[in-house]
Amino acid sequence: KRVVIYDTVIKDLDSDELSSLIAHELGHVKSNDIYRGLGFALLVIPLGVLFVQLATVSLARWRGDDLDGPAVIPALALFAALAVLFIGVPGNALSRNIEAHADRFALDRTGDPGGMVGLQRKLTLTNLSDPDPPAAFRFIFGTHPSTMQRIGAAEAYDEGPGK
């Protein structure tokens, strides 16, 4: 198993932020997150392909179109886009959950919410990300908790019991 951290990230982070980043990535390794994502994909991708095939064939037959003709292509594209959207929403929810757990793992290991907060701020600036995108956008497209959600979780950790 490997954890890859790019040199450009290393040079931009202080030691507390880098510790938070490394601990976060190790949290993914410890939790076998790659297998959770792979399991989800192996379950839903065949269902998505089946949906696209059945919906396209049903529409073509209903319209009386030839299944080998070009008229099927727009329907195929539409149903493929719908499948990606409907598979993406729960997949992204799983991804956000995985990322939040890796953040918590990092906080538990480093005991340094300030390092996590600094890391999130720098990553947002470096990646030119919206720190607090609209809720609907996060729900449909967000693969990670928003920067503000992650900072809020780190600050709540700092204020938790025994702090």
Region locations from a protein language model:
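Polar-ligand-bearing catalytic/cofactor-coordination segments
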Residues: 1-67, 81-163
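Hydrophobic alpha-helical transmembrane segments
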Residues: 68-77
